[in-house]
Amino acid sequence: MSGLFSLESWSTVWTHRESFLLGLGNTLQTAVCALALAFIIGAALGLMSTSGSKLLRIIARIYVEFVQNTPLLLQLCFLYYALAFAGVSLGVFRTGIIALGVYTGAYMGEVVRAAIESVPKGQFEAAQAQGFNYLQRMGYIILPQSIPVMLPPMVNQVVNLFKNTSCLYIVGGADLISVTYSFVTGASTGGAYAPAYIVCGLIFFVVCFPLSTLAARWEASLKERKGRVNPGLKTAAKKVELKEAA
């Protein structure tokens, strides 16, 4: 081709646009499934990290530290290649879901933990004084206040997860990055490097930028309301006052 940014290169990318859309579809499918797994792991880790059991807190801490301090690529390669040598073949799609879910779940667990710990300790004590069990304390007092706090950083983790799907390229996935690489190295399409990677980058940007903006505005809105009296605190305090009066 006559140049990296030639009209012929852009025309080639446009002609094969369905390949990029297919890659985007595979990326979204992997991201959604991995996100569901990450939510489950994150919620479990967050609750374990704030539980009264020292053993559960230690297990959660070990998991988080190990996953966060080892590269995602290494975890992905281990699941795909090391297990294959052991006779366990998960396939690219399932490997991607598990690796991304396990990795992102560690970060979501920290988000859940921080959100729960942001609730004043006095509200735990007020709920205990009313005879609430653990599930009641979490359901009526703690989670209603911590969920709005954890949502903005959760959205940021969703963005990170979507971008991390690019790591599937290392195991030959059919994600957007893999499709782009196959395109630029193809016998009939090779040479359109710049247009192909620009289109790939724009697709990532179109998906990630609105989510990042939403998270930033959401967080700013929460900070503006930070000084207001928390309804959960007022409810718990009122119940304590009624019990003492009785």
Regions found by a protein language model. Give the residues of each.
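Transmembrane alpha-helices and adjacent helix-loop boundaries
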Residues: 1-246
